[in-house]
Amino acid sequence: MNRLKEKYVKEVVPALMSKFNYKSIMQVPKIEKIVINMGVGDAVQNPKALDSAVEELTLIAGQRPVVTRAKKSIAGFRLRQGMPIGAKVTLRGERMYEFLDKLISVSLPRVRDFRGVSKKAFDGRGNYTLGIKEQLIFPEIDYDKVNKVRGMDIVIVTTANTDEEARELLALLGMPFQK
């Protein structure tokens, strides 16, 4: 069993049970999935940019991403409906815990001037969104092979009903929130 999953079962669940007075163990919020999304706007002019983004996401997530396409045409961006414009990957189960563990313990501390992640990035339904400015914070990415620094969005979807419960869940799992 994954290190983070073990921590969740042994420490986080009992702590949340006592803090929020849940009657059943099934009420305790858990992480449902993690979605990593990388928008590649320059794929319109340069289709090869998308291939490198897909490759990088595959290395980061450990599974192949889905290429996302434009929903509608925008003339100002020279964009046609259905053009490939980004990549996303949805992680569940073991891979999700492995990725979260790696994100918390290895990648986030590698961010320059890192002071913790924002406490305000919850959406009101218990989901947390985290923006990353560069893909170089992940140890799998080789600095010399990167042709362009790209950011990504990481959405952590939980079963929590309120932001407070989700914040407590992530904090107990080791998410470095700002003081």
Swiss-Prot record:
Disulfide bonds: none annotated. Signal peptide: none annotated. Keywords: Ribonucleoprotein, Ribosomal protein, RNA-binding, rRNA-binding, tRNA-binding. GO terms for biological process: translation. Coiled coil: none annotated. Gene3D superfamilies: 3.30.1440.10. One of its GO terms (molecular function) is structural constituent of ribosome. Changing residue 90 to A: A 4-fold decrease in binding of the 5S rRNA. GO terms for cellular component: ribonucleoprotein complex; ribosome. PROSITE patterns: RIBOSOMAL_L5. InterPro entries: Ribosomal_uL5, Ribosomal_uL5_bac-type, Ribosomal_uL5_C, Ribosomal_uL5_CS, Ribosomal_uL5_dom_sf, Ribosomal_uL5_N. Belongs to the universal ribosomal protein uL5 family. This is one of the proteins that bind and probably mediate the attachment of the 5S RNA into the large ribosomal subunit, where it forms part of the central protuberance. In the 70S ribosome it contacts protein S13 of the 30S subunit (bridge B1b), connecting the 2 subunits; this bridge is implicated in subunit movement. Contacts the P site tRNA; the 5S rRNA and some of its associated proteins might help stabilize positioning of ribosome-bound tRNAs. Contacts the P site tRNA. Forms a bridge to the 30S subunit in the 70S ribosome. Part of the 50S ribosomal subunit. Part of the 5S rRNA/L5/L18 subcomplex; in this organism only 2 proteins, L5 and L18 have been shown to be part of the 5S rRNA subcomplex, unlike E.coli and T.thermophilus where L25 (TL5) is also found. Has been shown to bind 5S rRNA. NCBIfam families: PRK00010.1 (NF000585). This is Large ribosomal subunit protein uL5. It comes from Geobacillus stearothermophilus (Bacillus stearothermophilus).
